[in-house]
Amino acid sequence: MVKGRSNKTLAENRKARHDYFVEEAYEAGIELVGTEVKSIREGKANLKDSYAEIRNGEVFLRNMHVSPYEQGNIFNKDPLRDRKLLLHKMQILKLTAYTTQQGYTLIPLSLYLKNGRVKVNLAVAKGKKNYDKRQDLIEKAAKRDIERELKDRSRY
């Protein structure tokens, strides 16, 4: 039997694109221990309010909640522990340069499986102000109205 090579999304940070301007995205591996992989495969991970930080030349993902695996008993770890992200040295240096600039942060966009391994889509992002969010909502509404008009026009 041939293994599927598709990327299966396990968790997504839906508010990320609403709250941030995404500048650049990177694929990173994640260091997991114990039964965390089984729990993540069941879809019991939450990326809401999580972010990455660089400490001593290493990137760590903070506040990612992974629910304890039900059959894991003593092997379960702390659900909110810091998890190390696996990146190349040049990527870490580039991310360090970005995050030293005012207003930039590292946020996870999604968690997915690639060839049986859990990967994180990590983005360099800048926070949106409230008026930016309102402007985005206005643009979405206008685009929706245009699409509706075009659809109605094509009916007749």
Curated annotation (Swiss-Prot):
**Biological process per Gene Ontology, one example term:** trans-translation
Q: Which domain of life is it from?
A: Bacteria
Q: Where in the cell is it found?
A: Cytoplasm
Query: Per the similarity annotation, which family is this?
Result: Belongs to the SmpB family.
Q: What is its main location?
A: cytoplasm
Pfam families tied to this protein: SmpB
Q: Look up and give the organism this protein is from.
A: Clostridium tetani (strain Massachusetts / E88)
The UniProt keyword set, sorted, is: Cytoplasm, RNA-binding
What's the protein called, per UniProt? SsrA-binding protein
GO: which molecular function terms?
Answer: RNA binding
The top of its lineage is: Bacteria, Bacillati, Bacillota, Clostridia, Eubacteriales
The gene for this chain is: smpB
The family database entries (InterPro entries) matched by this protein are listed as:
SmpB, SsrA-bd_prot, SsrA-bd_prot_CS
The record's function comment reads: Required for rescue of stalled ribosomes mediated by trans-translation. Binds to transfer-messenger RNA (tmRNA), required for stable association of tmRNA with ribosomes. tmRNA and SmpB together mimic tRNA shape, replacing the anticodon stem-loop with SmpB. tmRNA is encoded by the ssrA gene; the 2 termini fold to resemble tRNA(Ala) and it encodes a 'tag peptide', a short internal open reading frame. During trans-translation Ala-aminoacylated tmRNA acts like a tRNA, entering the A-site of stalled ribosomes, displacing the stalled mRNA.
GO cellular component terms?
A: cytosol
